[in-house]
Amino acid sequence: MQIGLVAQSPLDQFEIVPLIPMNIGNFYFSFTNSSLFMLLTLSFFLLLIHFITKKGGGNLVPNAWQSLVELLYDFVLNLVKEQIGGLSGNVKQMFFPCILVTFLFLLFCNLQGMIPYSFTVTSHFLITLALSFSIFIGITIVGFQRHGLHFFSFLLPAGVPLPLAPFLVLLELISYCFRALSLGIRLFANMMAGHSLVKILSGFAWTMLCMNEIFYFIGALGPLFIVLALTGLELGVAILQAYVFTILICIYLNDAINLH
């Protein structure tokens, strides 16, 4: 009876649990639940593409799954064409696969986290930060490859008085570095906050429903409807955050290419 009264923390759902611990010398590696669900996301994506294209490029009349993949493909392709300027269509195609894979990975990870008893990979700051910094380093390399040392002019707006130049360069450099940080924090914070809120309200509604009194049962209907509404909202947030992450990548890449 006492065990049933112990309240679980809404943050327990974000705990990384080692499934297969491994020790290599002084280094500790482990296959965790986070690794498992990232692998499941990748497997689902590869299987989906395989079943759609196994007959040699898809059906002439697309089925529902093929239509979904084509819709996502065209959506990201149009996003790249609209947000990245100053390049020919063939050059833009070089960046398209990376942006498409990033969008689909985040989309599937976010939606997978909505399944009960699953794990939300993007709710961990280190994972989103590693993703944002790795992409941002790649964007910076593209900027140096295209402009060389002239890429540093990105840090100094035109027409700035010389006495203010050192301060503005420092501020622009900090602002530039914080782009990668904010990119990871935005995704992590939205996914973690939304899932925690759904967990808190669903736990409250379940506790009210488990009580025998009719007053508590009626009182649980309000939180229950709120949970259902928040679940729908969280689905929208999962899709929106993948879109926001992707469009910001395109904007930052456009800035690096065109020195905006």
Swiss-Prot record:
SUPFAM superfamilies: F1F0 ATP synthase subunit A. It is a multi-pass membrane protein. PROSITE patterns: ATPASE_A. CDD domains: ATP-synt_Fo_a_6. InterPro entries: ATP_synth_F0_asu (IPR000568), ATP_synth_F0_asu_AS (IPR023011), ATP_synth_F0_asu_bact/mt (IPR045083), F0_ATP_A_sf (IPR035908). One of its GO terms (molecular function) is proton transmembrane transporter activity. It comes from the Eukaryota. One of its GO terms (cellular component) is proton-transporting ATP synthase complex. The chain crosses the membrane at residues 29-49, 95-115, 124-144, 151-171, 191-211, 213-233, 237-257. It is found in: Mitochondrion inner membrane. Keywords: ATP synthesis, CF(0), Hydrogen ion transport, Ion transport, Membrane, Mitochondrion, Mitochondrion inner membrane, Transmembrane, Transmembrane helix, Transport. GO terms for biological process: proton motive force-driven ATP synthesis. F-type ATPases have 2 components, CF(1) - the catalytic core - and CF(0) - the membrane proton channel. CF(1) has five subunits: alpha(3), beta(3), gamma(1), delta(1), epsilon(1). CF(0) has three main subunits: a, b and c. Mitochondrial membrane ATP synthase (F(1)F(0) ATP synthase or Complex V) produces ATP from ADP in the presence of a proton gradient across the membrane which is generated by electron transport complexes of the respiratory chain. F-type ATPases consist of two structural domains, F(1) - containing the extramembraneous catalytic core and F(0) - containing the membrane proton channel, linked together by a central stalk and a peripheral stalk. During catalysis, ATP synthesis in the catalytic domain of F(1) is coupled via a rotary mechanism of the central stalk subunits to proton translocation. HAMAP family: ATP_synth_a_bact. Belongs to the ATPase A chain family. This is ATP synthase subunit a. It comes from Brassica napus (Rape). The lineage of its organism: Eukaryota, Viridiplantae, Streptophyta, Embryophyta, Tracheophyta.
